[in-house]
Amino acid sequence: IEQIEEFMPLLINGSYPKIKQDHSKSNIWRKRNKSDGLIDWRMSADSIHNTVRALSKPYIGAEFIHNDVNYKLWETEIIKNNNKNIEPGKVLKIVDSDLPIIKCGINAIKIIESEPKLEVKKGTYI
């Protein structure tokens, strides 16, 4: 709070010191596009989860295609799963009556919210 109390008067009266950006230390990133949110189940569960979080509402959403249907993922949870003998993309189990857990390159992901709702059976590959 002290920092805000010190900063606000300087900002309001225009006396806050301005520092020019050193462009030799800056970088430019292209505009995000649809391909940035494509889910590859060979990715780690951490990477998939972070992609979903980064692109969740109000953004475009992370997505994957299953049976010619485009699914957007809005919420996921990382599930620890060290079984290396299962290929990424396999539905390991269904929990809470309708939430699939899908094997990733490392660990697994529970899909909590998708659009449309993903309805799959255990053992299915996505």
Regions found by a protein language model. Give the residues of each.
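Anionic-ligand binding region
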Residues: 19-28
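An anion-binding loop in the catalytic cleft
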Residues: 41-126
